[in-house]
Regions:
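Anionic-ligand-binding alpha/beta catalytic cores of soluble enzymes and soluble regulatory domains
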Residues: 142-225
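A conserved acidic, glycine/proline-rich C-terminal tail/linker
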Residues: 211-283
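N-terminal glycine-/serine-/threonine-rich phosphate-binding loop
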Residues: 2-97
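Active-site histidine-anchored catalytic micro-motif
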Residues: 49-55, 69-70, 80-90, 95-153
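Generic C-terminus detector
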Residues: 267-322
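Flexible, glycine/charged-enriched surface loops at secondary-structure junctions
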Residues: 168-174, 241-244, 300-301
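Structural motif
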Residues: 24-27, 53-56, 84-87, 100-102, ...
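Conserved active-site and cofactor/substrate-binding residues in soluble primary-metabolism enzymes
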Residues: 37, 41, 50, 65, ...
Length: 322
């Protein structure tokens, strides 16, 4: 099955942002947290290079070392940000042989970070990869490169220079996009009557974002009615269990405490619980594979109706053999 991160979605907000931004724009994302000074230090590095830069912190609370989590937050945020340089650092391999890279996207942004798959969904979200260059030219880095803080010494200064208009090819040599490290991103299986997916992120409310978009669900199940009951099958073999949820457009479509499946504000499928935690109620967490179908009772009823219908119709199969 082909790996697929997303379909490209262009947000109305992004469409209204002028391509020629009148200030350098830099966004920052990391798993550093905010207790230590790392985020402030990197903001300072940007301002030392581009004093007029507008800086936005996407998040510094990415789960520690969780590349998939960081990639998802980039995927969600980037279409709503101005065109600029987006520095992302979730880098368990810092100081190793992994490459530092800068990606130019079709929208005109630069994504700067480690070559570990972190940047790929965001790049696809912005129209796809145009060019990739390794970050090697020390002229655009801090004078001393530590072995454990490439966010400060390498990624942030490179991003700031790109935001100022330094050509990408000045940063370092080109890299074949086909050779980039891929992301361990759950694949979506679409078959008649069922959608195979997995939990990719649990938010602070206990909502569970799934691999796959609303179009995948429609392709698998056909038309879905608001309020329709769906079955969520978890596990396999003797440990398999099935949970029931409602297809809804908002939390109040179901009773307090009831679980629902809905399309979230980013176009992703999401399991939630009205005024509660879907993760706790459904006993699911990140990485859990699951299958979404219609309940067996409805399928059985539909099959019975079809059989009754067929009994009333002439059947060519009933023709006597020659």
């Amino acid at each position: 099955m082909a790996r697929r991160y997303t379909r490209v979605i262009t947000s109305p907000a992004a469409a209204r942002i002028p391509r020629e931004w009148n200030r350098p724009f830099v966004s920052l994302l990391s798993d550093w947290g905010v207790r230590d000074p790392s985020p402030a230090i990197c903001r300072g590095v940007v301002l030392s290079i581009a004093p007029d830069a507008l800086i936005v912190d996407i998040s510094h609370e990415v789960d520690k070392f969780n590349i998939r989590h960081g990639a998802l937050l980039l995927w969600c945020a980037l279409p709503f940000l101005p065109i600029g340089a987006h520095v992302a650092v979730v880098d368990p391999g810092v100081g190793s042989s992994r490459r530092p890279i800068a990606i130019e996207t079709a929208r005109g942004d630069y994504l700067v970070g480690p070559d570990n798959g972190l940047l790929l969904p965001g790049a696809e979200r912005l129209g796809g990869i145009e060019r990739v260059h390794a970050i090697e030219n020390t002229q655009y880095l801090l004078p001393v490169l530590s072995s454990t803080f490439h966010g400060r010494d390498l990624f942030t200064p490179a991003g700031a220079h790109l935001a100022l208009g330094v050509p990408l090819e000045y940063i370092g040599p080109p890299v074949d996009p086909a050779g980039l490290a891929t992301l361990d991103w759950p694949q979506v299986g679409v078959r008649p009557g069922e959608l195979e997916t997995a939990v990719i992120y649990r938010d602070t409310f206990g909502n569970l974002k799934l691999a796959g978009l609303i179009a995948d669900l429609h392709e698998a199940l056909g038309g879905i009615e608001r309020g329709e009951e769906l079955a969520v099958r978890v596990g396999g073999g003797g440990r398999r269990r099935t949970e029931r949820v409602r297809w809804a457009s908002t939390f109040s479509d179901v009773a307090v405490g009831e679980c629902l499946l809905y399309e979230d504000s980013y176009g992703r499928l999401c399991l939630a619980r009205n005024q509660g935690s879907a993760a706790a109620a459904l006993r699911l967490d990140e990485g859990t594979p699951l299958t979404i179908t219609r309940p067996a009772t409805r399928l059985a009823a539909g099959s019975a109706a079809k059989a009754t219908d067929e009994e009333t119709q002439p059947s060519v199969a009933a023709r006597p053999a020659d």
